[in-house]
Amino acid sequence: ICGGFIALHDAFTRMISAGKMANHPIEEELAAVSVGVVDGEVCLDLPYVEDSTAEVDLNVVMTSSGKFVEVQGTAEDGPFERKSLEEMLDAAAVGITEITEAQRSLLSTPPVERAN
């Protein structure tokens, strides 16, 4: 999702530069992270080893303004408390804020032109 957002932004920027579009349709950045509970602790951006043993596994997609686009999760090892969900969503929001800030910084530079 994060890479797709960058590619889409670059494509729109190129279309504007080529005169095929007048305005950039993207209103804000979009990013996604995985978050879960491993050994009772909330973990952000789970690598495979942690993901494969997580008690709870969530994928969260948010905008840079903190609005949710998607929350998808599974209780892998039995039901979990609402408090755990809130902690995971808070951790996801922190991670997504970092990613969208990096996207904003990256996208402030012109896209790399490729040779045809």
Predicted ranges, named:
Residues 1-116:
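Polyanion-binding surfaces on beta-sheet-dominated domains and ring/shell assemblies
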